[in-house]
Every structure is written in structure tokens, then in C-alpha cells.
Design a protein with these regions (language model features):
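Class I S-adenosyl-L-methionine
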Residues: 1-108, 214
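Fold-independent oxyanion-binding glycine-rich loops
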Residues: 10-14, 35-37, 53-56, 80-82, ...
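A polyampholytic, Gly/Pro-enriched intrinsically disordered region
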Residues: 73-79, 126-137, 156-159, 211-220
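A contiguous loop/helix-start segment that scaffolds small-molecule binding in enzyme catalytic cores
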Residues: 5-7, 156-250
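Class I SAM-dependent methyltransferase SAM-binding "motif I" and its flanking Rossmann-like core
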Residues: 85-157
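A generic local secondary-structure boundary/capping motif
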Residues: 66, 122-124, 148-152, 181-183, ...
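Short, solvent-exposed amphipathic alpha-helical segments in soluble enzyme
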Residues: 21-25, 43-44, 92-95, 125, ...
Length: 250
């Protein structure tokens, strides 16, 4: 008997951000596979086996999930945010392509989730209200030269930007270089949003002009949003908000 594999996003952190479809997938799963921190968000119950694993073993995790599904289990692979954004959905399909006949009978479903990027944007207004791009600043899976090229092109195109994985203890230089490149374009009044641990008890959100933004304002739990030249800030009921207008004059 062949089981099924569901790849689901748990949202940015709060259980309030988990979609009903994902809640249903959790309820019927026999096995949950994922990074330790994400599997810890799943409540144990009878009939459910949890398979937490360390970071950077995405391919092994995907292979294990596919094999269990092929053996008849109802397997749920979990990611934070959305599983298709720098997460496990791509890892599963990468592994599937290496040996498609091995798992040809497994039904695979991807269930979307609310990303940290969109949750952060919602907290401060609508900074991604016009064209924007998303860049993963980790150079674990791609060269820094590619990241820098994409960053410069995004600035030339005047996109608002969202940065994932901006800074870690092992590679603080990448985000420092990113800030230097951003500031080299000379628009120091662009709003920069540092959104850490969005929707969790440890949430902190800060909006500063680009000229005042510092690399140590971010860590690996932070999503950084940078406005375009059109992004504005305003005060409303004592809070500073940011938004990018829907129209741009030619």
C-alpha cells in the first residue's frame, strides 16, 4: 500500500497563522518530518511519530519522507513560513528527480503557508505594496558573487526587497556587505524594517532609515524589508508605518 506525502508550511511562528488545510494535514499524519525547531511545534499524540533532524540535511530528510510514504505512511514534511520559499518543497522535488521510478506511486501535495516576509510586512503596513523581490542572503547553497549581482540589479530596478537569512555568527560579513551596497546607492531615507521572530512572544520590529541601519540589527531569526525609492513612512495612532504606493508616475 502506497501512502502519501504532504509538504506544509507552519507559518511564521504563531499557531494562529497555521491554515486550516495544514491543521487537517497534521491531524491525519502518521509521521512528521522536519527541522528540530519546526517539528517541536507539532503536538505529540497517539499514532503520530515525530522525526526531527538537524539543519543542512534537507536531502536526507526528503529521501526519508519519500521512502516512508512509499511504504504506506501518511507523511507530513513541515517547514516554517511557506514550504516553497527557501524551504522543503524544493528539496523534496530535487530528491524525487534523482530517482523518479522509486517513488512514482507516491501522491505529493504542497500546502502553502504564511511567510515571515508577509507577516512582517503586515505588521508595519504595506511596504511590499508594489513590485518587490526576495533574496536569500545565505551563501551556503550559492556563491556570494551571485547574491551581490542580484542585489545590485534589484537596486537598479528600484524594487522593494525582502532578505531572508541575513546574518549568522558564522558569516556576519555577508549582511555587512549587503548594507554597504544598499547605502552606496545614496538613498539614505529608504525605510528598512528589521522584523525578528514575527508572531512569537519574542517578536521585535524596528523601522529605521537606511542611513541609520546597522548590520547588528539583524540575526538569523530576522527578516529584513527594504523599501524602494517610492516607499513612504507615516505615523498613525502613535505607530510608525510603511507603505509602497500602488502606482508610480512615469
Amino acid at each position: 500500500m502506497t501512502g502519501c506525502l504532504t509538504i506544509a508550511g507552519l507559518g511564521p511562528g504563531s499557531s494562529d497563522h497555521i491554515t486550516p488545510a495544514v491543521e487537517q494535514a497534521i491531524a491525519v499524519a502518521t509521521d512528521v518530518v522536519g527541522y528540530i525547531r519546526y517539528v517541536a511545534r507539532i503536538a505529540p499524540r497517539d499514532g503520530l511519530v515525530l522525526h526531527p533532524s538537524d539543519n543542512r540535511v534537507e536531502a536526507d530528510r526528503a529521501r526519508h519522507a519519500l521512502d516512508m510514504a512509499a511504504a504506506g505512511r501518511r507523511v507530513l514534511v513541515v517547514s516554517s513560513g511557506d514550504p516553497g520559499v527557501f524551504a522543503m518543497a524544493a528539496a523534496v522535488y530535487e530528491v524525487l528527480e534523482t530517482d523518479p521510478t522509486r517513488w512514482q506511486d507516491v501522491d505529493i501535495t504542497v500546502l502553502p503557508g504564511i511567510t515571515a516576509m508577509l507577516a512582517a510586512a503586515a505588521r508595519v503596513g504595506a511596504p511590499l505594496g508594489h513590485d518587490f523581490c526576495v533574496i536569500n542572503l545565505s551563501d551556503n547553497l550559492k556563491p556570494w558573487a551571485m547574491i551581490e549581482q542580484r542585489l545590485r540589479l534589484a537596486l537598479q530596478a528600484d524594487f522593494a526587497m525582502a532578505f531572508y537569512n541575513p546574518r549568522s555568527k558564522s558569516r556576519p560579513e555577508g549582511f555587512r556587505k549587503t548594507m554597504q551596497i544598499l547605502k552606496s546607492f545614496g538613498e539614505g531615507n529608504r525605510p528598512v524594517i528589521f522584523a525578528r521572530a514575527v508572531s512569537t512572544p519574542d517578536e521585535s520590529i524596528m523601522i529605521v532609515p537606511l542611513a541609520e541601519a546597522q548590520p547588528d540589527m539583524a540575526d538569523m531569526q530576522t527578516v529584513v524589508l527594504v523599501g524602494s525609492s517610492q516607499t513612504r513612512t507615516l505615523s498613525h495612532k502613535g505607530a510608525v508605518l510603511a507603505y509602497t504606493p500602488r502606482s508610480v508616475k512615469g
